[in-house]
Amino acid sequence: LFYLLRHGERSDFWRVCLCLFAGMTIALSCYVLLPTGLALRPYRVYGSDIFARLVRMLYAVDSSKNVCPSIHVLNTVTLMIGYRRGRRWMRPAANVLGVAIILSTMLLKQHSCIDVVLGAALAFALDAAASSLERSGEMRRVPQRL
């Protein structure tokens, strides 16, 4: 996001911000109206290596409640879409990093496949809505400077 602010077009930055803010607001509204949770995590994480310790620490601070749609995936896919409009060299790096983030949320049992699909669908729907706003001229009132 900071890359878009510093080096990208201002309209791309504001478009990504609009999608991020609207998406997180919609997701939080879903959590209030229909709380969700997962029981995917193991009862105990065995091992004394650094990775087992990190997973235990993650499980201690991040509960498996309010998971659908996934805000992790929503934000990641929104930024991947935003970087798609940017510089050409940034696209592969953003895609690889984005896929790694999405896979890590599932492999660490923070989200299920349904959470991931709904988070990505929300990101694409908000991008389509932002495109519609852009075509209608509503986005022209966006400030060009911060």
List each language-model region with its residue ranges.
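Residues within membrane-spanning alpha-helices of integral membrane proteins
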Residues: L1, F21, T78-L79, N95-G98, ...
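Membrane-interface loops
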Residues: R6-M90, I102, L133-L146
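Residues in soluble alpha-helical coiled-coils and helical-bundle/repeat scaffolds
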Residues: L4-H7, L108
